[in-house]
Every structure is written in structure tokens, then in C-alpha cells.
Amino acid sequence: AVGVAEGMRAADTALIVVSGKDGVCVGTEKAVEAATKAGLTKVFFVNGLCDESARFYRVFESLKATFGPSVCPVVVPYIVDGQANTYVNLFDYKAYEYGTDGSVKQTALPDMGDRLEGLREAIKEAVAETSEELLDKFIMGEEFTPEEIILGVSQGVKDGTICPVFCGDAHNTFAIDQLLNSLTWLAPSAADKSGEIGVDLDGEPVDVSVNDGGAAAGIGFKTVSG
């Protein structure tokens, strides 16, 4: 737990990996607590879905039950005969099929029945938490526009009111591209954070802000003395 907290001190976003087999555990809750305390954006990644014993949808419901309506699905698996080779992006409504040889191709959107609509509803529920205006619209049963959903999720992730959920398999790199591509516009950049307070050579406090033209600066953590 101490190591997690130290790492978050130097991070802009906390990527919290959850086992697709074991689900939410004490470590998950401690990681969320540490990220919240550090004021970081929180992103969940449900991993290990190539394991036939993995149960993504059970884990997703556990995340919602534990952390509330802020948990928002972004990428979900389409599972056939225990195999999760196809992943659906709920934002662009596109499906991608992955191979163990590293190949990936767009494929037809699978028929997921009522489950897909339920997941879209979870997104709307999360977006409704981001502003009074959107909450009123949600309560009145009005549909969000695509722009409202994208902007709502983006802003909600940055201010911490939405925790997006991605999934895949790190070992086979399934859906890792969707996670990384989405983080480029979902997660806050260093420029979105407030500056750090450092000390100059005389030991006096100095504000260190993000500046492309400024001197190089970094945060040291988990160092070993001696």
C-alpha cells in the first residue's frame, strides 16, 4: 500500500488493474482510496479476460456496487464459448477482433441483446452525475446527445466524478490499444494539474509550473538511501 501511494505522488492518473477472475479485492479499494486522497483521476482496467474463468460482467457489477454510479463502462468484451476475442467500444459503437498473433481488425457489431443497452444506460447514469443540468435531463427521461455524452465523460473523468472501465488481456495485448488511445483524450495532461512547490538552491520555496519552455523538473520517489 505504501508503494502504491508513493507512485501516485508522481502520477497524473491512477490506472487501477482489477483481475477479471478475482474481481474487486482489498487492494482495489486501497488503490482507489489512495488515488482519491492524492486527487488523481481513476481508471479501471479489468485484466486477464483470455482466461476462461474470467467473468467480466460479474466484476463490472461488483465495481459499480463498491464504488457507485461513477463507474462507467467504455470497452466491454463479447464472449463466445468462454473466449473474449472481440471487444466493443461503447463510445464509437464499433467492435474489434484480436488475435494472439497481435492482429486486430474491425468487425461487425455483435448481437449482445439487452446487455448492450444496459451498458449504454450505465454510461448515461455516470454522465448524469457530472452536472445538475444533465442530472435533470436524465431524471426527466430525455436522451443525451452524442456530444453531451463524450464531453460529459471527458469532463467527469478529469474532475473525478467518473471512473471509466476498460478491459482486455495484457498478456496477449487484447484491447490495450483502445485503452491507450482513449487515455489520450480522457485522462488529464500534466498541464491540467496545478504546479508543484519546490525549493531553490537557497532552500526557499518556489512554484514549479508546467511550462514547455521551462527548465527540466521531476519528482523522485521510491528512492533507496545508502
Label each PLM-derived region with a short phrase.
Residues 1-226:
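Structural and coupling elements of P-loop NTPases
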